[in-house]
Every structure is written in structure tokens, then in C-alpha cells.
Amino acid sequence: MNVVRLARLVGPIMAKQKVGALVNISTFGAKEPSLSFPISSVIRAAVSSYCKLFASELGHANVRMNNILPGFINSYPADKQTINQIPMLRQGTPAEVAELASFLLSDKAAYITGQDFVIDGGLTKSI
């Protein structure tokens, strides 16, 4: 997985510097698997698990990792039936995902690590 490869490359450097933050962009399928995308769902769940392990391993060095799990974003078209299933009745925007990533990478999120952040307009029903 690319997430693991990147973490293995930069994690030790960040730990040595006693600071660092990584944000992975995944999908809401990590929380609600889809029969249409079974392999993707399994891999995304693995990324979520890896994030928690990474946070436990390098948290002492002030190195953080979090995941963003977007729903349907308007950079990729969705049909009307799909959009009608989203409680906010619209797709998200790349800017909304970027704002969340910016926050998670900032010092304002210094105590947040090992977490999944769903940004899907209320589509995901899992708790």
C-alpha cells in the first residue's frame, strides 16, 4: 500500500524531528463496504487500521496520521439517484475536502491522531 510506503519513508524522519502530520485520502467505503467495490472496501479498511497502528507507534514523537473518508465529490459525476440518497442532496467539493485536510495538518489539530473523518453530506449510516 502506498500509505505504508510513504509512512515508512517519512515517519522516521518526522520522529527524529519530533513533529509531523500525514493525512490519507481514502473513501467512506472504509466504514460502509460496498458489494460493487469489494477489494477497494477491504483495502480502505486496512488503511484505517494502519493509521491507528501508526498513531500508536509514533504518537510519542508528536507524529500524527489521520484519514479523510470522502463520499461523492463533484470532481466525479454521480447520477441523480445517488445524489438523492445524500441527506444534503448534493455532492461535496474538492475545496471542502481540502479544508478538512488543511485543518488536520495544522497545529490546531495537534491532539488528533489515528482517526477517520467522514465527509459525505450525511450519507454514511455507520456509527
Model-predicted segments: where are they?
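Short C-terminal tail/terminal secondary-structure segment
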Residues: 32, 102, 113-127
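A short hydrophobic alpha-helix cap/turn motif
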Residues: 15-16, 58-60, 73, 105
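A conserved structural motif in NAD(P)-dependent oxidoreductases
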Residues: 86-97, 108
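Short, small/polar-rich loop/turn modules that mediate ligand/substrate recognition or access, typified
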Residues: 59, 64, 112-114
